[in-house]
A protein has these predicted regions:
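A short beta-strand-turn-helix
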Residues: 30-50, 74
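Structural microenvironment flanking redox-active thiols in thiol-disulfide oxidoreductases
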Residues: 67-127
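Short active-site neighborhood of thiol/selenol oxidoreductases, capturing the structured segment around
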Residues: 42-70
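Thiol-/selenol-based redox modules, centered on thioredoxin-like
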Residues: 138-183
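Bacterial signal peptide processing site
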Residues: 16-18
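Short loop/turn microsegments at loop-to-beta-strand junctions
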Residues: 27-28, 50, 144-146
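C-terminal motif of bacterial Sec signal peptides marking the signal peptidase cleavage site
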Residues: 11-14
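Sec-dependent signal peptide recognition
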Residues: 2-8
């Protein structure tokens, strides 16, 4: 009798769809400069699931750890090459395209998937504070220790604090979930 109950329950569990991730915000279009020195238009990310972070190359605090973790995201999502990664600098005065290119190479980035962006300081600050809704100090963007998950319609679908246990596993799970939701 117990077998008769368990088999239908297992079949039902296999059909249950995961709960959709919430929509936490909407990003507007932006134009910045990539580590290649070429213009980067956010529209190139449209239709792609992507993960963002804010770092700077001379940081001796959490940035190297975050970039290493972003490399793990790159590795753990290698089977889905449509997933993009975007690292924004919070120190554009120092982090020129050549500096970002050297930093990217150090973290073994895949140039087809992982972009390092710089640009106008006011624009980057506005994007971090008002676009991504990351906390700043005194109205300016200080690097956050959170990753941000964005869907192909530029909607923010998750925040992941790097100091929380299991954040990377949850982030990669949610990336894969958004990939499965794509039309």
């Amino acid at each position: 009798m117990k077998r008769l109950v368990i088999v239908p329950l297992l079949a039902l569990a296999a059909c249950v769809q995961p709960k959709p991730l919430p929509v936490l915000g909407q990003l507007t279009e932006f134009q910045l400069t990539a580590q290649t020195g070429q213009p980067f238009d956010s529209r190139s990310l449209d239709g792609h699931v992507w993960v963002a972070d804010f770092v700077y190359t001379t940081c001796d605090g959490p940035c190297p750890m975050m970039s290493s973790q972003m490399h793990l995201v790159q590795t753990q999502t290698a089977e889905t090459p449509d997933v993009k990664l975007v690292s924004f600098t919070v120190d554009p005065a120092h982090d020129t395209p050549p500096v970002l290119a050297a930093y990217a190479k150090h973290f073994q980035y895949d140039p087809a998937r992982w972009h390092f962006l710089t640009g106008d300081p006011a624009r980057l600050n506005d994007l971090g504070l008002n676009g991504f809704k990351l906390n700043g100090v005194d109205g300016s963007l200080s690097h956050s220790t959170r990753f941000v998950l964005v869907d192909g319609a530029r909607r923010i679908r998750g925040y992941y604090t790097t100091s929380e246990d299991g954040f990377l596993r949850r982030l990669v799970h949610d990336v894969r979930q958004l990939e499965r939701e794509k039309p």
